[in-house]
């Protein structure tokens, strides 16, 4: 298709003037004179056969036609600028946007990211965290890493690994725990899922509905583990996500009993294809997950 000549300088002059509602400020941004900007806008109006601005004593006001044109130009220039940025340093750079549960991001993904960057230096990874409730389409994500059973409407889900829950606490509290029954004398920290402690009690040989003295509910495992580290109570959390704290012994695992309530999954929209950057990340993540699964 042969495109008509596009008056790019005039379009840039209009877009800058419309954002600032001022020829003078647009001229400063574009490093040209105010007269040059005014001339370019006038030439665009003549080409289109419509007025794009109302010239007022104290500035400019967009006409209906100008208001229609502005968002299209802003989006187009932003997309061009974003594409040019991907060639920084003489190489095309792919952008990959991944959303992940905060606990997974901090406890498992970040310690391994250096390896991904070394293998794929021209992929710009953008990470966002969520609390497992995520809208992939609305948030513009390529992938979302979630915890659960793997069934999310409209998504393809690839299993990474299970992350069983176990008891974690500070060393001072661990010294007081000689049997699972001793937990009933402590504040129990948990997520919004009320069934986790009953499931663990049952696995440890206690009544599933053992009487609890005190409990605190957290919306993230990161906050819950920090509370446990500070001696606020005893947490039930995935040990795999807190390997560094266990290695440094700032957190202890007093009992071997663990209970599985789900797995981590790599999910994407079924309605969209996978880019080369997505395929690279998926392959790397599945490789790392396989190593994690073998190590359990």
Curated annotation (Swiss-Prot):
Keywords: Activator, Cytoplasm, DNA-binding, Membrane, Transcription, Transcription regulation. Transcription regulator that plays a critical role in the expression of beta-lactamase AmpC, acting by positive regulation of the ampC gene. Has a wider role in the regulation of expression of genes involved in proteolysis, quorum sensing, and virulence. Acts by binding directly to the promoter region of the ampC gene. Probably does not regulate transcription of its own gene. Residues 91-289 form the LysR substrate-binding domain. Residues 6-63 form the HTH lysR-type domain. Its main location: cytoplasm. Belongs to the LysR transcriptional regulatory family. InterPro entries: AmpR_PBP2 (IPR037420), LysR_subst-bd (IPR005119), Tscrpt_reg_HTH_LysR (IPR000847), WH-like_DNA-bd_sf (IPR036388), WH_DNA-bd_sf (IPR036390). GO terms for biological process: DNA-templated transcription; negative regulation of single-species biofilm formation on inanimate substrate; positive regulation of protein secretion; positive regulation of proteolysis; positive regulation of secondary metabolite biosynthetic process; regulation of DNA-templated transcription. SUPFAM superfamilies: Periplasmic binding protein-like II, Winged helix' DNA-binding domain. The lineage of its organism: Bacteria, Pseudomonadati, Pseudomonadota, Gammaproteobacteria, Pseudomonadales. Induction: Up-regulated by beta-lactams. Expression is negatively regulated by sigma factor RpoN, possibly through promoter blocking. This is HTH-type transcriptional activator AmpR. Residues 23-42 bind DNA. Effector binding domain recognizes specific cell-wall-derived muropeptide products, probably acting as a link between cell-wall recycling/repair and the induction of resistance to beta-lactam antibiotics. Changing residue 135 to N: Increases the activation of ampC transcription, independent of the presence of beta-lactams. Homodimer. The keyword Cytoplasm applies. The keyword GTP-binding does not apply. Residues 83-296 are annotated as: Includes the LysR substrate-binding / effector-binding domain, involved in binding to specific cell-wall-derived muropeptide products, some of which have signaling functions, leading to disparate responses such as antibiotic resistance, virulence, and host cell inflammation.
């Amino acid at each position: 298709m042969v495109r008509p000549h596009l008056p790019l300088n005039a379009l840039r002059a209009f877009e800058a003037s419309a954002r600032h509602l001022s020829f003078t400020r647009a001229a400063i941004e574009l490093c040209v004179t105010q007269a040059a900007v005014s001339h370019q806008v006038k030439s665009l109006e003549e080409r289109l056969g419509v007025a794009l601005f109302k010239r007022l004593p104290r500035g400019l006001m967009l006409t209906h036609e100008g208001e229609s044109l502005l968002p299209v130009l802003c989006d187009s220039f932003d997309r061009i600028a974003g594409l040019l940025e991907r060639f920084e340093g003489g190489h095309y750079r792919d952008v990959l946007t991944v959303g992940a549960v905060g606990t997974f991001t901090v406890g498992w993904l970040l310690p391994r990211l250096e390896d991904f960057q070394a293998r794929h230096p021209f992929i710009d990874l953008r990470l966002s965290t969520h609390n497992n409730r995520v809208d992939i389409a609305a948030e513009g994500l390529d992938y979302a890493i979630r915890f659960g059973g793997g069934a999310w409407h409209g998504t393809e889900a690839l299993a990474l690994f299970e992350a069983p829950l176990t008891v974690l606490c500070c060393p001072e509290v661990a010294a007081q725990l000689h049997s699972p029954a001793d937990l009933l004398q402590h504040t129990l920290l948990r997520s919004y899922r009320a069934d986790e402690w009953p499931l663990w009690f049952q696995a440890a040989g206690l009544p599933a509905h053992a009487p609890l003295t005190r409990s605190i509910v957290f919306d993230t495992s990161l906050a819950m583990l920090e509370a446990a580290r500070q001696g606020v109570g005893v947490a039930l959390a995935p040990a795999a996500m807190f390997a560094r704290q266990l290695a440094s012994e700032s957190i202890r695992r007093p009992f071997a009993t663990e209970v599985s309530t789900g797995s981590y999954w790599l999910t994407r929209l079924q309605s969209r294809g996978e880019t080369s950057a997505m395929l690279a990340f998926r392959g790397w993540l599945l490789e790392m997950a396989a190593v994690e699964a073998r190590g359990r």
